Curated annotation (Swiss-Prot):
This is Ribonuclease T2. The keyword Disulfide bond applies. GO terms for biological process: RNA catabolic process. Disulfide bonds join 22-41, 30-77, 40-143, 85-135, 208-242.
Amino acid sequence: MGMLALGAMQLAAGAVFEFPSCPKDIPFSCQNSTAVADSCCFNSPGGALLQTQFWDTNPPSGPSDSWTIHGLWPDNCDGSYGQFCDKSREYSNITAILQEQGRTELLSYMKKYWPNYEGDDEEFWEHEWNKHGTCINTIEPSCYKDYSPQKEVGDYLQKTVDLFKGLDSYKALAKAGIVPDSSKTYKRSEIESALAAIHDGKKPYISCEDGALNEIWYFYNIKGNAITGEYQPIDTLTSPGCSTSGIKYLPKKSENSTASAWKFRSDKASQSVRFN
């Protein structure tokens, strides 16, 4: 999805602009040649934001014709990352926070498209906010004009959902003839090209488990803050997590299927595994 379309989607979602205006000439994150002092208008060090998605089949999660949300992660410009950046803003009551903010529609959507494939949804949402959301510097409480407690939590979750809605991976793959099948296999280049078509031609990261496609990461640089700023698609900063060919794309509820355990995130660049 293009940058203008993302901006229109933000307006359509009814976002309340509670952040100070950012300078028009501020650079995109990770694209600056000199240091940028305005920490509320420039995402740093986590200047590469990733909208990440799961395809869980055993047990299945979410609708059979849709990928599901993993999260929104602020990676550093070199592909490294921070985690659990503010213990004082770690929460264990995401559902209650959203209800208090009147975000019932968001909560309903999350229950359908942001499930924990094996466990409690609330625990999953808490983990994503506590580990990743607290590391986005442009949504810290001091960046709001009129801050109310936990406002940034609801904004983070809403932004994650908004980005996900603009990245329909299932339809993008299907349009290219790539559909879930118990026996058919695909080339990595075919999958990457199909997904790049909804990401301004920029290649996402794809991951496989036991030869089966199970995760996608879409990368962005941001101009302005992470909620109201302009999102610019960029190519993946991480090496592919699937082989070049013979990739399975299994139907949900398949007996010979794989599950993307949300607790783990593979860093293919360093061949390490990290809690996610």
